[in-house]
Amino acid sequence: MTAERIALISDCEGNVAALQAALRAIKRLAPDSIVVAGDILASPFSPDPPSETIALLRSEPVQAIPGNTDRCLLDWGTPRWPHTLWMRLRRSDPAGSWLDDMAGGQALIAPADLAWLRSLAEEFLVTEGVWVCHGMPGNPWNSIWPRSPIYDANVSAADRDASLRMLANVDATLVLCGHISSPPEYHDQLPDGRDLHVVRADARDAESVGYAVLTRRSDTWHTDWHSARIVARA
């Protein structure tokens, strides 16, 4: 039986060179699916023109979702904005002054590109049992972190339990996500007793961009993390 492979990228945040580097390296591996788990753009302003990031994604065989930074840009000025703002303000860390610049950031995104971003699924099953989200299932603003004081400041027990119940409902036992890069993976348990495996894309810095490649053999997923060197744009 042929092994199934999924490549995972996340949080390039409008850095075209980083996205290019990850996609170039991934395509050499010829996975069955390439997933971009959100934060396609930075909010409110990306380092490169948003049109270049969107054009690159639209030219490649990728399945992408919006992250929390994208949600701000997509929802500003729409009936959805109050809910998006409420989701952000629920976090314990201050929101900062980015609200003042959101209209200007959205204005830099072409209407056709905004429409494409808004057409993306917020979360989805990429293959049987594998759920793609940005942070935690149902909430791109937080992460489905392990139960630890270090990670739990923004996540209540009710939030976590709701995410785990949702995953059980859609029969997902593997979650691919981004938002943060550490820990790169951990294991939990669904309410019905099944094991849950959470995998994140690796970190990005000024010199390299991380990505994960998951391979299913005999109904078990194995993860390898890689990094690709970012080539500065001329």
What are these regions (language model features)?
Residues 187-234:
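Binuclear metal-dependent phosphoesterase catalytic core
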Residues 92-129:
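Metallo-beta-lactamase
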Residues 5-9, 14-107:
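Core catalytic region of metal-dependent phosphoesterases/phosphodiesterases
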Residues 13-18, 42-47, 69-76, 125, ...:
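Active-site environment of divalent metal-dependent phosphoester hydrolases
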